[in-house]
Each structure stands twice: as C-alpha cells, then as structure tokens.
Amino acid sequence: MYSLVSCAALAGIAEWVCCPGRLNAPLYRALAACPAVHRWDVADNSAAAFFALGRVQATGRPVAVVAGSGNEAAAMLPAAVNAYYGRHPLLIVTVDDAANGGGTGAPGCVEQESLFGIYAPTVQLELPCPVSDLPDLAGQLAEGFPVHLQLRVDADAVMPARDMSTLTVAEPPETPPFRGSLVALSQMLRFHAQEGLVLMIGALEPAEQEPVLWLARTLRVPVVADAASGLREELAASCLHDAEDILCETPPPYVLRVGAVPESPFWPMLEDMPDTQVFSITRSGFSGLTRQSEVIEGEPEQIMKALGDVPHVGDALRLLPASRQASGRTEELLLESQESAPALVRAFSMHASLAECVCLGSPTASALWNRYAQWQVPTLYLRSLHTMGSQGVLSTFLGLSAGAESAFCLVGDLAVLRDMAAPAILPQLPPGRRVIAVLANNGAEQALDDTEDDPELERLLCQPQEFRLADLAALWGAACYPIHTEADFEVLDTADDDALIFLEILPE
C-alpha cells in the first residue's frame, strides 16, 4: 500500500477521499503515515465521489476516492459520468479480496472489473507487487479522464510499516498538446467572419478565462456567455440578451464556441440550422451536437497561441441593438414583479457576487441566473454543477468551496433531497460561510414547460415533496430563512462568517 501511495503522489495526487470498507484499513494506515497527503473521511460513497470531484475542480489536480465494500462502489458511477464529460482526472479506487473476489457471490464481493464502463476504464493491480508492476497513473490521468483502479489484496496479509515522512507530491501531469486542425477555423476568422459571427462561451476553468477574454475583446463580435464561463459580467456590453429569440430571427452564418457545451437554449437549436457553420474550441473534446461541426480539442491558451493574430470582426449582423431593447424589457419586468423568481435571483446574485465561489445546482437555477443575474460585478469563480444531472450537487459544492471563506450555491429543492448526506462533511472543512439558496419549484414543476396545457402529464411528471427545509437545516445544524422579497436577504448582513445558511426562496 505504501508503494501505491507513492505511485499516486508521482501522479500529483495530494488528496484522498476515503469511505469505510472491510479491506481498506491497510491503505488508510499508509495514508495516515504520509504527512504530504490530505485525507478526507466520508461515509456515503456517492457523496464522497462528488466531493472528490469538487476537489478536482477546485485544485486542478487529480484526486483519489476510495470506495467501500461490495455494491457501495457502484454509487460512484454518477460522479464518474460527470468527471468523464467534464474531463476531470478522478481516480476511483476499489479494493477486492484476491482469494474471494467478484463472481463468487460471497458477501461483500461484486465484479469490479469494468464497473464504470467507458466512464472510468479499469486498471487492475494485485498487491503486494514489485515496483515495476505499479501502473503509470501519471500517464493515465494526463488525458484528464477518470480512471478506476481495482486493487486485489490478500485480506489476511500483514503490511509492513514504512517511513513516509519524506514523501513529496509531484506536480500534476502536463496537459497534452491540442488535437485538430486550425486551418478551417483560421480561414473562417480571416476571410468569412465579416459575414456574421457569434461567439458562444460555455463553462471555463479559471486558467482558461484570460485567453478567451482576449479572443472576445479582439473579435468584438456579439457574445452568448454562460454564467459558468466567469466572463458574463466582463463582456456585458457584448452579450446578447434573449439570444435564442434574436439569433433565430437572424441566424448567423458562423458560430464559434469556446469551453464546455453552452447552456444557452440557442445551442440545441443549431441542430436544425445546417446553414450555420459551427466551430468549437474545447478542453473536453465533445462537440455537443449530432450534426457536423469542426472541433479542436485542447487548452484554449495553447490553441490561441497557435491561431496567431485574429481580426476585429464586429457586429456584422447588427444584433446588439436588438439585444439592448431586450435588456430594457427585462429590467422593466424585474421592476414590475419584485417578488417573482427572476427578481429574487437578481437580488441573490448581488449578495453572491463578492463570494469566492458561486455554484449553480439545477437547470432552473442556471436559466434564471444566465438571464436575470446582475451584470455589474464580475463573479470570480462560478460553476454549474448539474450538467449531467442534479445528483451530488451539494457534495460537489462543498468540495469546490472547501478552501473558500465565502461560498454561495443556488439549487432546486429536488437537488437538496437527492444529496442529504452531503453536510456530514462539514466538520472536516476549514471555517467559512456557505450559503445555499433553495428554489422552491414544486418538485421540478417550474422546469416542465411542455406540461402547461396538460394537467395529467404534469401530475405524472412532477414530484412534489412534502418536506420542510427548516427541518433539514436543523438536522445539519444550519440556520434557515424564508425569502419572499429582496429585503429578506438582509439576514445575510448579520450572519456569522463561519456558518452554514439555507435560504428558502419562495417566489410569487
């Protein structure tokens, strides 16, 4: 086990999230003997995996999570899915009895090979083993995808103790070179973009924001920026309001997407716009479309350097004047409906704008934030946590905000119910104020636009939950405040700097 910890340290793994398990004790003894490694203890396997995913996103380093026995490891599959599509290097470790493994039906023994399918390929390792047999974790995690390490151990063996006090953790693996040809993109920018180009910016890592901001300011084209890009407020003057309406009325000949797959409603509409050519610069490598498009996979900074100088293109289709009119209509709406969900999200965004970390934990939360949140103060670090589903949102938020003095999260009520074990992690976190605003959306009713004229379908699809958020908050030792108007947010002005606070947003 000591050689395994050393192997992981060479891959840049400085944090281990550990679940209790029948065969995990030797590994945990080795981790306890290594002061260079930080260990988190989480009882729930799903919460542990999502917390580890949050730590990967917060640190930019690979993080290991150790599963419990038997079928408990399967609870980590949703986190593996999120890590795969977000391209985050998560190492999932499962421990199996070499003498009585999966396939026997013995208590606590399940087939672990290929447990996570394509989302985390399995690497098998039988311990103890020679150093030469240890896997190249650094190389396998360098691509940025999750990996499943299946350990097979002798349950009766006694592991000798070793001195781990001098072990150091290496820097994370270097990012591989970008993949894809820049020829078509370069020709479009230099010779055709003046016909009409829109820049769509999805979620970005903090290190990606500066080169993408340079690109947007150089091109000077209309922008559709997700809140999770971190550039929505910086590029406010170029951002399109009600983008889906404006761009459907005046389809652009070219769209350049940078970052993750955009959350804008206009993005899926591109499936039915074959005359619009789509180019993507993305770290994940996923096109986000079933139709043909040009994808360049890699870090934006590498790609911008290879692309060289780009021209000033401007608003060739005159989209921004229509956007300013839409912005005016939005402001009128907020003034007329000050107790509506959009108005309360606007007020919440003003309080959250100065936090070190802001997270959005449901599609409804992201849609409201992207359209109605404040535009004046740049949000330093904003994440969407629900891209592949709303499971594990609170655990991921706590992992992301573990080192933050102030962190805010906006989620739906179902996301809270699906991650009720998350706050058990709180006693291990450094001091800080964590504010979780919960949108009361009647069991996802507000997210189902297609049920407005079909009450029976609404009855079948909606899942209203009879629960009181205040009771859950009390279970976790948190304060809970109902929010009906903008003035109700004043409770945050007097709240402790080290507290977990729930805000139950109850719009008209």
Labelled PLM ranges:
Residues 4-14, 19-32, 323-404:
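Active-site diphosphate/adenylate-binding microenvironment
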Residues 1-66, 71-74:
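N-terminal cofactor/phosphate-binding cores enriched in small/glycine residues
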Residues 19-21, 68, 127-129, 150-153, ...:
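Structural motif
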Residues 83, 93-137, 225-322, 426, ...:
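Glycine-rich, acidic loop regions that bind phosphate or pyrophosphate groups
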